[in-house]
Amino acid sequence: MRDAIPAHCYRRSVAIGVLFLSVAYAMYGVTTYLLYTAQSLWALIAFAVIRGLTIGPTFIVGHDACHDALTPSARWNRVLGQIALLPSWHSFTAWRFRHNFIHHRHTQVLELDDGYPPADEAQFRRMTYLQKLRYRLSRTIPFAGLLYSQEWFESHLLPNAARRQDYKLAGRYFALDYAFVIAWMVCEIALFAGLFSRLGLINESHFHPATMLFFGIIVTQFFWHWEMGFVTFLHHFHPDVAWFRESEAPAAAERQLISTVHVKFPAGFNWGLFNILEHTAHHIAPQIPLYQLANAQAALKDAYPQRVTEEKFSLMTVWKTFAVCKLWDPTAKRWIGYPE
């Protein structure tokens, strides 16, 4: 299947990688400045939301680097990747391990993929009341971020001993990466808590530190988590896309082709998310850089027109996906609703 993608789609450049990181950080930096200097509550709310969404492009650059797709240099990918992942509070080593070696290796495999696999009816019935509530909410548009929040908290912010050992085995720089992330988090909290202004390093914000912490940290992270959960859901959930038991899963390449959805957003949105919406091509060949994904996706569509799942974005199609994709029946191989 990779042979269907032209060779030029695999070309990578340090200069272009640095350019995309610079653009992503420029968007993030401008919204951070506008949030910190906001003079009205409405401006504060608006810039907190926008700042959360601009974490997406920085994360996508880091995601590319974790696949060694951003540039042809492993060293540049590591450095640029960790810088890019800081606003999303992610360690390069931990994300690379969980995303590359679990999600990509086991895409759409119920027992193994950590990309929010759906429960079946029996699993749902065994859940506690709170677990059922969380599951139901996470499959709604407003609370799609819950899908990602639990993964981030348990696997990235406070990984248990077993996960930490996995990360250390996967990369010798895990402790250093994690230290960078914690330092970034502390600095970000200190900024909105007013510590830097008390030290005379910057001007005071217009609002009380508690208000700034709420909007600068909680609201911003809420909308970043929502963006991550929402986009990931659209990539791997669709009324016509199946999930598989491990014993019945197709070969890896076939599974990536038929199970990854290409959501066709308007061009501006696609650019703002650095082409990650061209997701089938990314799963077939993760080493393709984000700046070549559109060409690679078009080539796959030409080669496999009946097997690539495409969905033109609209409020109706998004509503349908969330409405239908609740529980998965692995025997009947279809989506089902919640039990009464």
Model-predicted segments: where are they?
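Aspartate-rich (DDxxD/NDxxD/DxxxD) Mg2+/diphosphate-binding motifs
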Residues: 61-79, 107-120
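Membrane-spanning helices that line or support transport/gating and their immediate boundary helices
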Residues: 61-65, 98-105, 229, 233, ...
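Transmembrane alpha-helical segments that form the membrane-embedded catalytic/substrate-channel core
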Residues: 52-62, 91-95, 143-155, 217-247, ...
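Non-catalytic, topology-defining segments of multipass membrane proteins
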Residues: 1-54, 86-219, 291-340
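Active-site-flanking alpha-helical
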Residues: 31, 66, 70-71, 243, ...
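C-terminal, well-structured subdomains that either form a transmembrane helix-short loop-helix hairpin
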Residues: 271-293
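Cytosolic juxtamembrane regulatory segments of multi-pass membrane proteins
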Residues: 249-268, 323
